[in-house]
Amino acid sequence: MKVGFIGLGIMGKPMCRNLMKAGYEAVVYNRSKASVEELAAEGAQAAGSPAEVAENCQVIITMLPNSPQVREVCLGENGIASAAKEGTIVIDMSSIDPVQSKEIGAELNKKGIDLMDAPVSGGEPKAIDGTISVMVGGSKENFDKYYDLLMAMAGSVVYVGELGSGNVAKLANQVIVALNIAAVSEALTLAVKNDADPELVYKAIRGGLAGSTVLDAKAPMMMAHNFKPGFRIELHIKDLNNALNAGHAVNAALPLTSQVMEIMQSLKADGNEKDDHSAIVKYYEKISDTSVEKEN
């Protein structure tokens, strides 16, 4: 099967590479040409625009930064809709506002193009080894039809519901992760301010109800002051903003999300937006006049 892939960034490039390893023919487009040239050298067909991808493929995956980019690639000049044949399927794996997913899907549908939203979780390491989690919204018929395609890039692929539901699930994930990281930061700050060893506190609580994937992934980074990004603060701000917009659209109260969003905005103002989101602890260190960093 020939598959179009638009958006070859940190996540998109390894995901596309995994499709190629699974035997799919890839037609690729990216605004920056270096990634296109890299995958073309590995056997992909290079395209000069989203429209050219659509001319060559009836299955197209997009992996883009946010809603405006998805809208432009799908509906803009030289976009997918300008050249796609009726019956084309677009699988948008970007993390965007679910309201936007529905609006873009409705416009594509007028031209006989189906849209599925299929955002992912797991970050670059899981994109590389093909174990990302995929949350899918759209028709169940399309989910069943393209399940194997998605599994070529993933460790799990779950159908959530109608179009937009995939992004609702992703935003729920991002809310939980953000609030958990803030809670870990707060707890380690409490420990240090009470003269307790934060590493021993971490070891004491990780086997109980407070134990979590977030605790195990982020507490060691905080104590090492290693903020090399697995997921940057600026990207989490984008996701929380989308979550708040989605919540406001349906009158869902998200007070804790709003609070953590303000913490992240404060960190951005201090120049930390490129740091891993575990750098939320810097906010707590600053206002508490302390550090959770362990001495070597």
Residue ranges of model-derived segments:
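Interdomain hinge/lid region at the active-site interface
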Residues: L163, N167, G211-H277, N296
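Rossmann-fold NAD(P) dinucleotide-binding segment
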Residues: P50-D114
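Residues in the short beta-alpha loop(s) of Rossmann-like NAD(P)-binding domains
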Residues: S32, N66, S139
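Active-site-proximal catalytic alpha-helix in oxidoreductases
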Residues: D129-G137, V158, L163-N194, K203-A217, ...
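Hydrophobic beta-strand scaffold residues
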Residues: A26, A46, L115-M116, V157, ...
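Rossmann-fold dinucleotide-binding core
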Residues: S95-Q174
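NAD(P)+-binding Rossmann beta1-loop-alpha1 motif at the extreme N-terminus of oxidoreductases
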Residues: M1-M63, T88, M93
